[in-house]
A protein has these predicted regions:
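Substrate-binding cleft of secreted/luminal carbohydrate-active enzymes
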Residues: 17-40, 54-128
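Amphipathic helical hotspot of TIR/SEFIR-family domains
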Residues: 42-45
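Flexible internal linker/loop segments at domain or repeat junctions
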Residues: 1-15, 22-23
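Short beta-strand/loop segments at the ligand-binding rim of alpha/beta enzyme cores
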Residues: 1-5, 53-58
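Beta-strand signatures of extracellular beta-sandwich domains
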Residues: 165-167
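Pro/Thr/Ser/Gly-rich low-complexity, intrinsically disordered linker/stalk tracts
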Residues: 106-162
Length: 167
C-alpha cells in the first residue's frame, strides 16, 4: 500500500493483494521488493501485518548487486534476509537467477554457508487441514509423438501426517 517511487498496484492498476490474501483468494504472495534501506523495511512490515495469515515470500532484487545495475553491497541483501527472518516472513525469492548462479559478489556462497545450510520444509498452510498430501505413487513421464510430455501418477494412501520425505 506504500507508494514505491510514486507507483503502487493498489492505486495505479486497482490490485488489492492484501485484501485477496485476507479473503482467502490467494494462499501465497511473492511481492517484488527490489528496494534497499528505508524503501524496503516498511514494505516488509506492511506485508507481515496485512498477510491475512497467508504466506508472504518477498522477492529480493539481487540483480542490484551487479556493477551494471546499482552495485549494491552484498551486506544489503544479507540485512534484508535477516530482517525477513526476524519478522517471520515465509522465505525469500530472488530476481534474477542468473546473478545467483554467477555468484555475483558471493551471494551464492553467502546463502549456502549462512542461510540455507539444510533443506527447507514448506511452511504449513495453517488455514488448511494439518495433514500434508501424500507422496504420489508410481510417477510416470512419457514423451508423446507430438513432442508434448504426459505426466501421471497413482494416488497414494500412505499418508500418516507425520513423516517428512526428501526427494
Amino acid at each position: 500500500r506504500y507508494p514505491s517511487r510514486g507507483w503502487n498496484a493498489y492505486h495505479v492498476v486497482y490490485q488489492d493483494a492484501q485484501k485477496w490474501l485476507k479473503e482467502g483468494i490467494h494462499d501465497a504472495l511473492f511481492p517484488m521488493m527490489y528496494f534497499q534501506g528505508n524503501n524496503f523495511y516498511p514494505f516488509a512490515l506492511d506485508w507481515k501485518e496485512n498477510c491475512g495469515n497467508r504466506w508472504i515470500v518477498p522477492g529480493l532484487g539481487i540483480y542490484f548487486l551487479s556493477p551494471d545495475e546499482q552495485n549494491w553491497p552484498l551486506d544489503e541483501i544479507v540485512r534484508q534476509l535477516h530482517f525477513t527472518r526476524q519478522i517471520k516472513l515465509n522465505g525469500q525469492a530472488y530476481f534474477r537467477n542468473r546473478f545467483l548462479l554467477n555468484n555475483t559478489k558471493g551471494i551464492w556462497d553467502e546463502l549456502q554457508e549462512n542461510f540455507y545450510t539444510t533443506p527447507a520444509l514448506i511452511p504449513p498452510m495453517t488455514w488448511m487441514d494439518s495433514i500434508p498430501p501424500s507422496t504420489p505413487a508410481m510417477p510416470s513421464l512419457q514423451l508423446l509423438p507430438d513432442g508434448k510430455m504426459h505426466m501421471s501418477w497413482q494416488i497414494s494412501t500412505d499418508n500418516n501426517g507425520g513423516l517428512v520425505t526428501y526427494h
